[in-house]
Amino acid sequence: MKRFKLAMITALVAAMGALAANADTIGYVNYKTVESNYEFAKNAYKELDAEYLNLQQYLMDKEKQYKNIESPIQRKNFEETVQKDFKVKNDNFTKLKMKKAEEVENNIVNAAKAVAAEKKIDVVLDYRVIFTGGTDLTDDVIYYLNNNKKFKKNK
């Protein structure tokens, strides 16, 4: 009976060791930190801010023009024209905003995948879901994105 228990304990320990060897390695990334330190993202958001300011300036200019129109019919026609033009401009801005956001996100995700592969990390999560453990890949992802390098060398 003692040998059976010893054999079972030995088998259990061996099985736990095998499970530990096959366990996924976990890394995490602080997405907001990566995004705020990623030069392409900074430039994309500056471009979007400039476009937004252009939209605001367009509306202010049209408002000034509107105040100078005296005829009710001309005012109505002007309003309709401005509404159509603004809708086109706003739609283009929205498309550009979506395109830039998607491009930034795809670049960050692809960089995280590349860094994880280089560091032999199986799973990458957002830092907010990790309470303890794991490998922080944030700086490596930022380095990869800004320098077109594989990953930052360990310190």
Model-derived features: positions:
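Short beta-strand-centered segments that line the small-molecule binding cleft or hinge
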Residues: 138
